[in-house]
Amino acid sequence: MDRGDPAGDPDQCHAVAIDGRAPTYDGGIVSRVDSVPLGIVVNNAGKRFFDEGEDFWPKRYAIWGRLIAAQTDQIGYAITDAKADGLFMPTVLPPLKSKTIDGLAKQIDIPAAALLQTIDQFNAATISGSFNHQALDDCRTQGLLINK
């Protein structure tokens, strides 16, 4: 290889998802969003855009920065329910919470109807299994455009 020749894959990078409320420069590990495999991630349109459970977290956390950067306004929202509390390292910033999906959609300024549809379709497609958040398990969805 000659000096200055391109190397690697320019479409790939090691980039983690961080809380958008973190400091502009280097929020550090305390701003990394680790809840991704325990819920869903939606874009500004309220739609999922990748399989959140493709692999268990220690192997896949570094792809989410790139995936979110490819979304409109480079924003994604990791959404979990109360069952996920305590199963991941929270960011230093408190989570946004709501008793309703509509209320959450208003807080994050995305279309409530789209978010509700995404969550309803996801929940309806869920196939129960033996849950283990530390390894690939047999919990999944079936019949979605992007299955988990």
Question: PLM ranges: what are they?
Answer:
Residues 1-148:
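Residues forming the flavin
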